[in-house]
UniProtKB/Swiss-Prot annotation:
Protein name: Autophagy-related protein 9
Subunit structure: Homotrimer; forms a homotrimer with a central pore that forms a path between the two membrane leaflets. Interacts with ATG23 and ATG27 to form a cycling complex for trafficking to the PAS. Interacts (via N-terminus) with ATG11, required for recruitment of ATG9 to the PAS for the Cvt pathway during nutrient-rich conditions. Interacts (via N-terminus) with ATG17; required for recruitment to the PAS during autophagy and starved conditions. Interacts with ATG2 and ATG18; required for the retrieval of ATG9 from the PAS to the cytoplasmic pool. Interacts with ATG41.
Modified residues (Phosphoserine): S19, S122, S143, S144, S657, S787, S792, S802, S831, S842, S864, S948, S969
Primary location recorded for the protein, binned into one broad class: membrane
Entry's Gene Ontology BP terms: autophagy of mitochondrion; lipid transport; piecemeal microautophagy of the nucleus; protein localization to phagophore assembly site; reticulophagy
Regions that span the bilayer: 319-339, 377-397, 621-641, 657-677
Function: Phospholipid scramblase involved in autophagy and cytoplasm to vacuole transport (Cvt) vesicle formation. Cycles between the preautophagosomal structure/phagophore assembly site (PAS) and the cytoplasmic vesicle pool and supplies membrane for the growing autophagosome. Lipid scramblase activity plays a key role in preautophagosomal structure/phagophore assembly by distributing the phospholipids that arrive through ATG2 from the cytoplasmic to the luminal leaflet of the bilayer, thereby driving autophagosomal membrane expansion. Required for mitophagy.
Organism lineage: Eukaryota, Fungi, Dikarya, Ascomycota, Saccharomycotina
Region called Disordered, residue ranges: 29-88, 127-159, 214-234
UniProt catalytic activity: a 1,2-diacyl-sn-glycero-3-phosphocholine(in) = a 1,2-diacyl-sn-glycero-3-phosphocholine(out); a 1,2-diacyl-sn-glycero-3-phospho-L-serine(in) = a 1,2-diacyl-sn-glycero-3-phospho-L-serine(out); a 1,2-diacyl-sn-glycero-3-phosphoethanolamine(in) = a 1,2-diacyl-sn-glycero-3-phosphoethanolamine(out); a 1,2-diacyl-sn-glycero-3-phospho-(1D-myo-inositol-3-phosphate)(in) = a 1,2-diacyl-sn-glycero-3-phospho-(1D-myo-inositol-3-phosphate)(out)
Keyword Isomerase: no
Highest taxon, organism lineage: Eukaryota
Keywords: Autophagy, Cytoplasmic vesicle, Endoplasmic reticulum, Golgi apparatus, Isopeptide bond, Lipid transport, Membrane, Mitochondrion, Phosphoprotein, Transmembrane, Transmembrane helix, Transport, Ubl conjugation
Length: 997
C-alpha cells in the first residue's frame, strides 16, 4: 500500500501520529521519541467532517523542521473535555497497538498498517461526529505540577535553563478518572506511545476568511456584539483564564462608545486568500503589501513580542517619528563625542589671550598628531559601536515597515492618527482582526489569539514590568552600602538598568517566559548562586566602563542643562519624581503612556504641597548669599564704568579677570534670589495630599493624621526630589553601582528567586505571569474577586480603605494592616479599579497627549488644579472674610467656626465698636456696615470690613483700642502713649526695624 494513499490535500505532511507508530523503518526500534516533534499538533477541522485521514511519514526526518513553530503561550494544563477525548483515543487504539507490537514485532508490515489505519479512520469519524471539542492540544510551558509528573521522560543532558515551552509536553493519564489506563502496568515504550501519540486530525488551513465555515459556526454559537475585551455583550466574561470565572457585570460592556468617539473602519481582509495558504516564507516577496502583512500576522510565533512591538510602534507615534528619533539619538552621540574630543585635543588654549581668530588657536592635523595611543583606541571602538547602531537601524527600518503595513492595511490606522488615537481603539481593531482571521500557521497560537482582550494584551506587554512593580514594592532589594551617606536604598537609572539586565535577563528567556529552573524549589540554591555570580560579573564590567560612562554623561548633562540653568536660574529648584517613586506609583497592567500622563499631571499639586511648608532658615541664608554676591557685582560693575576696556581684563586673582568674577557672582546671585520663597500659600497639606493622591495613587497609612508634619514632607521629598540632586545622584551612581552590585545585591539573590517562584501564577493561554496582575485574589475575606462585579469590588475597597470613592469610581485605598501581604493585595485591588476606569470610562478615551474633558483638569493654562487661588486683592478686599479662603470645606467646620457674637446675621450692628458712630465718617474712617439683601429673602448679609474692623469686637480677647488714639502719632502699638515723643519713636523704630534686610 502506498503511503500517499491516505494523505489529504493541504496536509503538508504534518500528520505525525502514524509515522510515530509505524514509520520507524529501521530494524532496531528506538523507544525514545523526538521531543521537538511533539510540539506540532494541528487543529481539529470541524468543517471537514468525517473525512479526516492522515498521511504517514517514512521517518521522523521527513518532518519539515522549518514548519515546526515554537509554541508561544498555550501553556496550560488540559481541560476535562480534552482529558476525556484523550482517554477515549488511548483506549480505542490500545488493542490494535498491542496486537501490532506484541505479535510478531513486525512494525513495518503492510497488514498491520492497514488494520490500524482502518480502525483509526472509524474512530476519528466517531470522535468528530460526536464531539464538538475544538480546543487546541496543550503544548508549551508546563505548569509546575506537570513538570514534576513528567520528569521521568526528560533527558539527563537537557539544559535546566531550557524554557518549559520548548520541551514536549507529556500528557499524563494517571488517576484523573476511574477508567484511565494505568501506565505503570505497561513497558516504558508503550507508555511513551499511549501518553504522547494522539490521532492527528487534518491541519487547519493557513488562513480563514471572514466567511469561512469555522468562523460562521463560531459566530452563530457566539452571537452578539463584542466589546473591547473580546466578549459578548450579554453574559460577558472579562478577565481570567479559560478555566476560571472572570469578572462579570463590568461597565466594559459598552460596545459602541469607542467607535462613536473615534470612528474606525473594521479590518476588511481579502475575499480570496486561498493563494496564501500555500505560500512559503521564501516567496512572500511575491505577494502584495496587504497580503504580506496578512501572512506576517498569521505566522506570528511569539505573541508577547509581537504585541510589544505593536505597542512600541503606537508609543513612538509611527514609522517616521521612530526612525527620526533613532537617527537623532545617533547624531547626539556623535556630537557629544566629537565635540569633546575636538575641544580637548585640537584647541591650543595657551594662545587664547593673544589671538583674535579661531584659526590661530586650532592645532593642525590634531587627529593624527595630538590624538594617540589610548584615546585613539577608544575612538576606533566608538566608530565600531556607531557602525553597529547604523546596522541595527537598518533592520529596525525593515521591522518598522512591517508594523506600518500591519497598522495601515490590517488595522486601518494611519501614522497620522496615532498621536490622537486612544490605545483602546487599537485593541478594538485587534479584536476585529482576530474575529475575522483567528487561525494561524502556528496552531498552538490559536488559543492565545482567541484571548486577545484589554487585560490579556496588557499582561503580555507588561509581563516583565508587572514583576518589577511587585519587586520594587516588596522592598527585598538591598541597594545600600555600609559607608556614610550611602546607607539608604537609593535607586538610580543606572542601577535600575543593571538590575533589569541581571535579574530579568536571568529569570526570563529570549522568548519572554520564566525559565523552568526559577520555578522549581529543588533548584533554588543553584539559581541563587548563579544570580549572585551574575551580579558580581555585572559589577566588574561596570568598574571597567565607569570612567567612560562618567565622562559621557557629564558632558551630556552639561550640554543639555547648562543653558537652561543659565537663562532660567529658578529652574535649579525644579523637582521631579525619583526612579523608585515611579515604580511605587505605577499600577499593575498600567501601560506606560497612561502612567506618564498621570504622573505629569501630578507635578502641579506636588509642587503646591512642598511649597506650602515655610523654608525660613533656607531663605535667611540665601538672602545673605545674594546680598554678598550682589554687592561685589555692583562694585565691579561700578568700577568698570570708569575704564571699561582695561578694567574688564584686570586680574583680581591669578588668571582670573573681572569678567570671570562678574559672571560667577552674578550667577550665584541669580540662583539664590530665584530660590527664595516670596509667595504666600494657603497651608492645607492634608487636602493637597488627598488631591495629589488622585494622580500618584500613593498615600501610606503611616502618613494619616500627620500630613502637616515636617517629617512627612521630607519623606515625600525623597520621592519628589530636586532635579539637580537627582542628576548628581546619577553621576555618583556610575561610580557607586559596581560596589552595590558586588557587595549588596548578592545578599538579596535568594529572596529574589523566592519572589519569582512565589508570585508567579499560571494562566491557561498566557503562561506564567505575576499573580497580582491577574486581579484574582481569593484570600480577601474568603471571597473571589473574579466572581464580583466592579461595583461590589469598589465598595469593598472603600470599606477597607481609609478614603472614599469619588464619582469616577476612583478609590482612595490604603491598607488597614501593615503586613507586606496585605499591602500587596491592596495595591492589586487598587490597580484593578484604576484599570477598569481607564478602559471602561469613556472620558478616558483620549490620545497620549490629550486630557479627558472632565472636571478636575485645567481647561486653560491659567486654570489651577486647586480651588486655592491666592490673591491679596481678592482675599482682603472690602466685604471678604479671610477665613473663607481655606482649601477645604472644613475651614468653617468644627473648631473653625466664627463666633456668633462676632458675625450675627440678625443684628450685626450690636457687635461693632459702639464708640464708632457716624462721626467717624467725617474723620476719614469708615465703619463696618451690614447690608441686608432683601431681594434674596434670606438672612445672608454682605459685610464691608474696613479699618474699623480692627477696633470691633471681632477680637474680644484684645484690649479695645481707641481708633482716634491710633491716629495720634504719640500712640504706640501696645495701647500706651510714648513718653519720649519723637526720640521715643526713633528709639522704637531702631529697636524693631529690619535693618539687615
Amino acid at each position: 500500500m502506498e503511503r500517499d494513499e491516505y494523505q489529504l490535500p493541504n496536509s503538508h505532511g504534518k500528520n505525525t501520529f502514524l509515522s510515530r507508530i509505524f514509520g520507524l523503518q529501521s530494524d532496531e526500534v528506538n523507544p525514545s521519541l523526538n521531543s521537538q516533534e511533539m510540539s506540532n499538533f494541528p487543529l481539529p477541522d470541524i468543517e471537514r467532517g468525517s473525512s479526516l485521514l492522515h498521511s504517514t511519514n517514512d521517518s521522523r526526518e521527513d518532518v519539515d523542521e522549518n514548519d515546526l513553530r515554537v509554541p508561544e503561550s498555550d501553556q496550560g494544563t488540559s481541560t476535562e473535555e480534552e482529558d476525556e477525548v484523550d482517554e477515549e483515543q488511548v483506549q480505542a487504539y490500545a488493542p490494535q497497538i498491542s496486537d501490532g507490537l506484541n505479535g510478531d514485532h513486525q512494525l513495518n508490515s503492510v497488514t498491520s498498517k492497514e488494520n490500524v489505519l482502518e480502525t483509526e479512520k472509524s474512530n476519528l469519524e466517531r470522535l468528530v461526529e460526536g464531539s464538538t471539542d475544538d480546543s487546541v492540544p496543550k503544548v508549551g510551558q508546563l505548569s509546575s505540577e506537570e513538570e514534576e509528573d513528567n520528569e521521568f521522560i526528560n533527558n539527563d543532558g537537557f539544559d535546566d535553563d531550557t524554557p518549559l515551552f520548548q520541551k514536549s509536553k507529556i500528557h499524563e493519564f494517571s488517576s484523573k478518572k476511574s477508567n484511565t489506563i494505568e501506565d505503570g502496568k505497561r513497558p516504558l515504550f508503550f507508555r511513551h506511545i499511549y501518553q504522547n501519540n494522539r490521532p492527528q486530525r487534518d491541519t487547519q488551513k493557513l488562513f480563514t476568511s471572514s466567511n469561512a465555515i469555522h468562523h460562521d459556526k463560531d459566530k452563530s454559537a457566539n452571537n452578539g456584539p463584542r466589546n473591547i475585551n473580546g466578549n459578548q455583550k450579554h453574559g460577558t466574561k472579562y478577565f481570567g483564564s479559560a478555566t476560571q470565572p472572570r469578572f462579570t457585570g463590568s461597565p466594559l460592556n459598552n460596545t459602541n462608545r469607542f467607535t462613536k468617539l473615534f470612528p474606525l473602519r473594521k479590518p476588511n481582509l481579502l475575499s480570496n486568500i486561498s493563494v496564501l495558504n500555500n505560500t512559503p516564507e521564501d516567496r512572500i516577496n511575491t505577494l502584495s503589501v496587504k497580503e504580506r502583512a496578512l501572512w506576517k500576522w498569521a505566522n506570528v510565533e511569539n505573541l508577547d513580542i509581537f504585541l510589544q512591538d505593536v505597542y512600541n510602534y503606537y508609543l513612538g507615534n509611527g514609522f517616521y517619528c521612530i526612525i527620526l528619533e533613532k537617527i537623532l539619538n545617533i547624531c547626539t552621540l556623535l556630537f557629544v563625542v566629537f565635540v569633546s574630543t575636538y575641544m580637548g585635543h585640537c584647541v591650543d588654549y595657551s594662545k587664547l589671550p593673544t589671538s583674535h581668530r579661531v584659526s590661530d588657536i586650532i592645532i593642525d592635523k590634531c587627529y593624527s598628531n595630538s590624538i594617540t595611543g589610548f584615546t585613539k583606541f577608544f575612538l576606533w571602538m566608538f566608530y565600531f559601536f556607531v557602525i553597529l547602531k547604523i546596522v541595527q537601524l537598518y533592520f529596525d527600518v525593515q521591522k518598522l515597515s512591517e508594523l506600518q503595513n500591519f497598522y495601515k492595511y490590517l488595522l486601518n490606522i494611519s501614522d497620522d492618527e496615532l498621536q490622537t488615537l486612544p490605545w483602546q481603539n487599537v485593541i478594538q481593531q485587534l479584536m476585529y482582526l482576530k474575529d475575522q482571521n483567528a487561525m494561524t500557521a502556528n496552531v498552538v497560537e490559536v488559543k492565545a489569539k482567541n484571548r486577545i482582550d484589554a487585560h490579556d494584551v496588557a499582561n503580555r506587554i507588561m509581563r516583565r514590568e508587572n514583576y518589577l512593580i511587585a519587586l520594587y514594592n516588596s522592598d527585598i532589594l538591598n541597594l545600600s552600602l555600609p559607608i556614610p551617606l550611602f546607607r539608604t536604598n537609593v535607586l538610580t537609572k543606572t542601577l535600575e538598568w543593571n538590575i533589569n539586565l541581571c535579574v530579568m535577563g536571568f529569570v526570563f528567556n529570549e522568548s519572554g517566559f520564566i525559565k523552568q529552573s526559577i520555578l522549581k524549589p529543588s533548584q533554588r540554591e543553584f539559581t541563587r548562586e548563579e544570580l549572585q555570580k551574575r551580579f558580581m560579573l555585572a559589577g566588574f564590567l561596570n568598574i571597567i566602563l565607569a570612567p567612560f560612562l562618567v565622562t559621557y554623561f557629564v558632558l551630556l548633562y552639561f550640554f543639555r542643562y547648562f543653558n537652561e540653568y543659565k537663562t532660567s536660574p529658578g529652574s535649579i529648584g525644579a523637582r521631579q519624581y525619583t526612579p523608585i517613586a515611579e515604580w511605587k506609583f505605577r499600577e499593575y497592567n498600567e501601560l506606560y503612556h497612561i502612567f506618564k500622563k498621570r504622573i505629569s499631571l501630578s507635578t502641579t499639586l506636588a509642587n503646591k504641597y512642598v511649597d506650602q511648608f515655610p523654608k525660613e532658615k533656607t531663605n535667611l541664608f540665601l538672602k545673605f548669599v545674594s546680598f554678598i554676591c550682589g554687592s561685589f557685582v555692583a562694585i565691579l560693575a561700578f568700577l568698570t564704568v570708569f575704564d571699561p576696556e582695561n578694567f574688564l581684563n584686570f586680574e583680581i586673582t591669578s588668571d582670573r579677570s573681572v569678567i570671570f568674577y562678574i559672571t560667577i557672582l552674578g550667577a550665584i546671585w541669580s540662583v539664590s534670589r530665584n530660590t527664595i520663597t516670596q509667595e504666600y500659600h494657603v497651608f492645607d497639606p492634608e487636602e493637597t495630599l488627598k488631591e495629589l493622591y488622585e494622580y500618584t495613587h500613593y498615600l501610606p497609612k503611616e502618613w494619616e493624621g500627620r500630613y502637616h508634619k515636617e517629617e512627612i514632607k521630607l519623606e515625600f521629598c525623597k520621592l519628589y526630589n530636586l532635579r539637580i540632586v537627582i542628576l548628581l545622584r546619577e553621576l555618583t551612581s556610575l561610580m557607586i553601582t559596581p560596589f552595590v552590585l558586588w557587595f549588596s545585591l548578592p545578599s538579596s539573590a535568594g529572596r529574589i528567586v523566592d519572589f519569582f517562584r512565589e508570585n508567579s501564577e499560571y494562566v491557561d493561554g498566557l503562561g506564567y505571569v505575576c499573580k497580582y496582575a491577574m486581579f484574582n485574589m481569593k484570600n480577601i475575606d474568603g471571597e473571589d474577586t473574579h466572581s464580583m462585579d466592579e461595583d461590589s469590588l469598589t465598595k469593598k475597597i472603600a470599606v477597607n480603605g481609609s478614603h472614599t470613592l469619588n464619582s469616577k469610581r476612583r478609590s482612595k485605598f490604603t491598607a488597614e494592616d501593615h503586613s507586606d501581604k496585605d499591602l500587596a493585595n491592596n495595591k492589586m485591588l487598587q490597580s484593578y479599579v484604576y484599570f477598569m476606569d481607564d478602559y471602561s470610562n469613556s472620558e478616558n478615551l483620549t490620545g497620549k497627549y490629550q486630557l479627558p474633558a472632565k472636571k478636575g483638569y485645567p481647561n486653560n493654562e491659567g486654570d489651577s488644579f486647586l480651588n486655592n487661588k491666592y490673591s491679596w486683592r481678592k482675599q482682603f478686599q472690602p466685604g471678604q472674610k479671610p477665613e473663607l479662603f481655606r482649601i477645604g470645606k472644613h475651614a468653617l467646620g468644627p473648631g473653625h467656626n466664627i463666633s456668633p457674637a462676632i458675625y450675627s446675621t440678625r443684628n450685626p450692628g450690636k457687635n461693632w465698636d459702639n464708640n464708632n458712630n457716624g462721626d467717624d465718617i467725617k474723620n476719614g474712617t469708615n465703619n463696618a456696615t451690614a447690608k441686608n439683601d432683601d431681594n434674596n429673602g434670606n438672612n445672608d448679609h454682605e459685610y464691608v470690613l474696613t479699618e474699623s474692623f480692627l477696633d470691633s469686637g471681632a477680637f474680644p480677647n484684645h484690649d479695645v483700642i481707641d481708633h482716634n488714639k491710633m491716629l495720634n502719632s504719640n500712640y504706640n502699638g501696645n495701647g500706651i502713649l510714648n513718653k519720649g515723643g519723637v526720640l521715643g519713636l526713633v528709639k522704637e523704630y531702631y529697636k524693631k526695624s529690619d535693618v539687615g534686610r
